[in-house]
Amino acid sequence: MVDNGIDPAVRTEPRKGAQAIRRALAVLRILAAGREEGLPLAEVVRATGLTRPTVHRIVHALIEEGIVERQDKTGRYAIGGQVLELALARPSRSPLLAAADDVLRQLAQRLGDTLFLTVRTGNDTLCVDRRIGSYPIQVLAIEVGARRPLGVSSAGVAILAAMPAQEARKIVAANQARFAAYRTDASGVLAQIAAARRRGYTMREVGLVQGTKSISTWIKRPDHRPVAAITLSAVRTRLGPRREPELAEILLDAAREIEQAIRPAVR
């Protein structure tokens, strides 16, 4: 055995540090899904799979840094104001958002129903844009900034369907404990992914709001990895079997247009 003079404890520090950072980010992603209402500590423990003492230490360290806040009335934990201040340091608008801007606006005007742009972030989806159409009844189930586990929305299923099968199964397994809150399970999500691959798009017969339906198509980066999804949501009577193929083709064309626009400089 070679003695290089380095304390074994020192050699393990970088690995432990990276693990601590990943755990803290996992906690932050779960808290982000709670939005302004926040989440109880028990929910964060369940969703992350970490022990309660570990989550407690992480949360209170993040509170000290202003990254997390504890709500006085409810005792729940939520994302803190320091996160917004850090986000303001981003130097420019995302090329994806810029490319999708006109496409979403034109689609909302043409189709009359609500359009969403959703991106993948880790094992979650994040709604980054929403456009309201002219039809009197609009489906507004998801707000910009809403975060959900990959697989519980039609956008999430579309993104998973565009991934290699093994990678998609791994994410579904990781999110399994979180699915119950959305009245679904891993087997149901996997079945929807398989159906989306056969169709070339996702058709959700029952949307996040009762009496609604949604269609989603994936958007791929130049390296062919899915980066986002476009979703059209409407009341069920607006998405019947006759209109579905037409709308799906329109969304597929829109996705291809965005893919072409982001080809030089996606990030």
Question: Each PLM stretch: what is its role?
Answer:
Residues 30, 99-110, 116, 195, ...:
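Amphipathic alpha-helical regulatory segments at dimerization interfaces
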Residues 160, 167-170, 255-267:
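Cysteine/selenocysteine-centered motifs that mediate thiol-based redox chemistry or coordinate metal-sulfur cofactors
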Residues 2-93, 97, 256, 260-264:
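N-terminal helix-turn-helix
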Residues 68-70, 117-118, 219:
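A structural signal for short hydrophobic beta-strand segments in well-ordered beta-sheet cores
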